[in-house]
Structures are given as C-alpha cells and as structure tokens.
C-alpha cells in the first residue's frame, strides 16, 4: 500500500503568486529603480528582492493544506475523501483520523474514527470530530484533552469549539495535575476554556482530592497558564488566639499589565468581618501601592479598627525624584490584635510617615523631606517616641579621584519636634545645622594602601528648652538658646595584604595576612550644653572600630579621640576556586587620652585599651559552616557580647541551625545602651521519611532585654516557637500544618495554626506558611518544587 500525498493551495494564495510573477515579468531588472521593492532598510546596488519572495503573514484562508492518506479520492479543488492513516496538516496544526472528508470550498474537515487534533501543543482526541480549518470551530464527541501550556488534562461527553482559543466542554472532568493518576480534579456540568484570556470557568463545579469532594461552587474560575487573571483566589484559613477562626477570601483584579488590585474579605471569629485591599501600579518612571483594611465595631475591642499605607516612588526627570511612605492605624494595639497569619507584624513599633523630594547628579545630591513617626505603645513597656523631622534638608557633594584627591561635603538642616509621651513633653525641641567637608588622598598600590583624611565639622543649634528639661538637667545657666561647635577631625588609615601558598585540610590553599592600622585625632570640645536629638552610643564592632565617632545618628556628640585601632585578618582561600574556607579576625583600640565627651548619664571611659574584638568563620566542609563574633573585656576578664552560630546542610531540603547570643548588662541604666541578652536559637528542616518533613524553630531567652522592646521580659521565656510537618505527596500535591507562638507584647503572646493543601496546577487551600518558614529557618527549601510552564513546542507530531 502506498501513501498518497497532496498539496492544496487556496485560490487567493495561487492568485497572489501569479500576480507576483506577472509583476516580475513586467518590470525588467535593468529598468527597475534600485531598492524600489526591497525590504525597508535593505539597499544593495544592482540587486532587488522579487515581490514573489516578499515575506508576509498569510491569513487563515491563504494557508496551504498538506494531505496524506493510504487512499485518496475526489477533486482537490472541490472535495476529497482520505482513508487509512489520514491526516491534514497546516503550519498551525495537524488533524488525523481513520478517514477524513475535506471540503475545499468551506475548509470543513470531518473526521471519523480515532480523531486526533494537535495545535499549539494542545492535543484533543475522540471517536469523531468536525473542524473548520479557517475559523478553527467545530465539535468533538467524547473528547480527551492534553493542554500543553499548563500540563492539564480533561475529558468530557462533548466539546464545542468556537475559535482557536475558546471552547466549551459538557459533563467535564479536568485536572491540572501532571501525574499519570491525578490526585485532584474538578467535575462540572460545563467548563469554558479561554486560552487567550487564560481563564477556565467551571459551572456547578466540585473540587475532589483523593476522590473526596473538598470544595463546591456554582461558579469556579482558575487560570489555564501560570499567568495573572482576574477572579477569586483560593481562600485562606487558620486559627489564632487573637482572632479565633480566621478565613480570608481574596478577589484579584488583573486591571492592566502594569497595575492590579486585590479585594480581601476576612472573617475573624472573635472580631467580625473585615474588608481590605491593595492596589499596585508600575510605570516607566514610577511605582507605588495603596493598601488598607477596615473592621467596623470590633466585637472584642468595641470600636472600629483600620489600617492604611500609601507608598510611591517616581523619577521626575532631569535628576529630580520624589517618594513617600505614609501609614497609620486606628490604635496602638492594631498589629498585636490583627496580625496576619504567617507574618509577625505584632513587633511593629514605629509607623513611618515620610515624604521626600530630591535631586541628584554626578557630583551632587540633595533632598527635602518630612519624617514623622507614629509610635505604637505597649502599655506594659512604654517607650519615649523619637523626634520628628519637620523638615530635614540634606545636601551632599562628592568628587572622587580628583587629581588623586577624594573631596566630599555633607550638610543637613533639621527642625526637631517630639510628640507628647503619656501626655507630657519629654525633651527639648529646636533646629540643627551641620556641615562636614572632608578631603582624603588615597594611595593604593598592589598589596598595600595608605589614606590620610582631614575634615572640619561645624554644628549650630537653636534650641527651645522647657521646664521639664531644666528640672532634669539642672541649672539653667549652661543651656542657652543658641550653641555651636567646630571640630577638626583627622585620620590615617593604612593596611597591607600578604599571601603565601599553603594547605588546609589536605587541599591546596592560599593564606592571606591582612594587618590594618587606623589612627584618629579629634580634639576635645565641651558639648554638655548641646541637646541630644537622634544620637546614641554605637555598638562596638569591627566596622565601628574603624569609624570617626563612637556615637551614631546625627552626631549631637563627637567624642574626643587620640587613639589607634589595630586589626589583623587572615584567610584561607581555595587555590583553584578562591572560595573562602576559613577567616580569623581580631581588633583592639589603644587610647592615648581619656574620654571627656559623653551623653547625659553616660560613664566616661578611663581605660587605655578597648575590649578585644574577635571573629571567625569557617566552611569546615561543603555542608557545615560556623561563625563566631565576640567582644572580650581584658580588665575584668569577662565577655561583653558574643554570637556563635553553626549550620549543617547535608542535602537538599535538610538543614540544622544553632545560634547563641549573649549581651552583657550595661554598667549604667541609660536608655540608649542596649540591655542584657542571653538567648539560644534552634531551627531545622529535616526529612523523617521520603515524604514526611519536620520544620521548627525555638527562640529561648535565658535572660532577655528589659528595655521596653516588644516581647521583652526579665525572666526566662520562649519568645518564639514554630513547629510543623510537611508531607510531599505525589507530583500533584503537598500538605502542611504549622504551629506558631510568638510574643506580641511584654506580657502577651499570640498562638496561630496554619493548614495548607498545595495542589499543583491549581493553587493552595489554606494559609501559606512559606514566608514564615523562609524567614525563620536558615536555608529552608520548599518540598514542593515549581512545575515549569509548558510551551507551544511541548508536543510535535
């Protein structure tokens, strides 16, 4: 038996070819203007492109059809009957069957026996089918679908195809699960699929999991591909000691490619029905969002609760830009009572209200901003609110490598205002003007550098002192309305790097030795009469040891200094890859004069040497890493602070992390000094079997901060506990249950339970704990891997 092949060209395509040939014959090449019919942008003297070869998109009725069968009868220009391994093939699809009847006048194809239609990687099979090649409309009896773009499958009693992208299935079974035996599926009386709109609409649909119905809806929508679409998202649910039963039903609006919105109805068993939403937008030069919630008459609190936040960033052109971040809540306890499941927003203490307009160029940048705070007070641990900046003006000019010099100037002008604290005015108010020009001359060579630097800091204050300040600070005489300070600051920074080949753990390595010296000279100026707005004592660390001031913030205090910082670092690097295996560091300051400048209540330093700083990090193996950072007091032989951590990751989705943090109590009880801390943290993700995984984290405060921080307590307590199980089913689903308990105030905690059923190809039912696990467990990896999106090249015949 011989296979017969036939090519059918439409009348229009044949006429077009004839017209092109006629044009070619009528215009000899020698008389045709050069490039007159060439494609745009193509000019080659002496050559031209024949109109018959010009590339243009064919319409549906111009596409040629290729036919093949064991037996073929009829007229190609009228009707053809193909029998035995029959197929009709065009560039946009293939139709196969036992027999095919083709009508050239209407482009109708009728398939009988083992109908098989393939287009854009979507395959449809059935006992019979009718299809129009031009409109791609028709119908199929008892079809089976394999949707290439999503990997989904479907079967139905009947399918009506309306166009290339739209069809309706009757009495349908659908699943987006790529497994051979899907674990979940949807049954519906009808299912409308719109590929262009990326939407599937099931009517009278029931979602089954393991053949058990778990969700029913008269109207259910879902995406066909992994793209955005408008419609209801899967509901989230959980339980919390603050909200009770917590159910959220979001509706997503895919308004445009560059902006969208989500409307969320949230029911809380203890509080009532809350309405929330957010709107996001993104443009070529701007981006922002608007979000908020409203709960009328909270059943537990007895009044209305709300939250809002507006963010925006925009480039205005010519170097100008603007941004703002404005947020607010109805009351101080909003986040403690209404925290979203999986997101510990209960620790939110300050809400920013900031707006800024700025400009920048190659060497200059400036901005004007208003920066205010809403302080959310914990009645069991009240804190003094920070100063508002109303406004702040910043100007910076910088030129680097300017004939070898680095020149920079920073200046600010700020007006400070402080909100009332417990109905009282705490602290002074006023304006501060600061200018700090510096010049440096870096000398950098292979293996060493030397950088001298000099600057002059000028600060002026206009202060309004109040009776509360006079009573607290003492005599009125030293505190004038206007004060100024001028201080020269000089430093020398130098370092070297030595290298040598060596071995580490039997492997070739390169060891470096990196000594560093930093000398700082700042003369003494009496600053006791200056106010303190936004300055605090900086933590002593490797970074701070090589800084110009022991205070951080706005430099309301600049400490006198005649000191030398000595640092030494050594590293072991893999000789072939450069990967750092081990690093050891140490540093100490040597003081040549006593400290005379202090913050109010601070005890001045009299020691001639600082604490020792030591640090170490090691990748002992490819799976085990350790880190250590500590501060040791050589005078009383005690540790001032320390952090020791280790992480073991023997394989994918397996990690164990352990950390210990220690902070010694400050010598004096001053508000700006960090409180003592003694805390152990254990976090893990561990497979119990091939399918069962355990996750967890415990933060245990042996003795924690009592300085007014949210969740603080002087007694031992568990500040956070997370425990959960993950079950990795087949390729279709993953189940999770996670328990979380965390501090929301000094004497209060919240308990939450998360349930989630993740269905591949559909979405997830329940509250998503993945953000919580990713943030809380170092090295966490989801047990369910994302399924890559299908393409039009997924299947070819």
UniProtKB/Swiss-Prot annotation:
GO biological process, one term: lipopolysaccharide transport
Superkingdom assignment: Bacteria
Positions of disulphide bridges: none
Predominant location: membrane
Keyword Membrane: yes
Localization per Swiss-Prot or TrEMBL: Cell outer membrane
Keywords: Cell outer membrane, Membrane, Signal
Signal peptide location: 1-20
Cross-referenced Pfam families: LptD
One Gene Ontology CC term in the entry: cell outer membrane
Chain segments carrying region Disordered: 23-45
Subunit structure: Component of the lipopolysaccharide transport and assembly complex. Interacts with LptE and LptA.
Role this protein plays: Together with LptE, is involved in the assembly of lipopolysaccharide (LPS) at the surface of the outer membrane.
Family listed: Belongs to the LptD family.
Protein's UniProt name: LPS-assembly protein LptD
Organism, as annotated: Bordetella avium (strain 197N)
The gene coding this protein: lptD
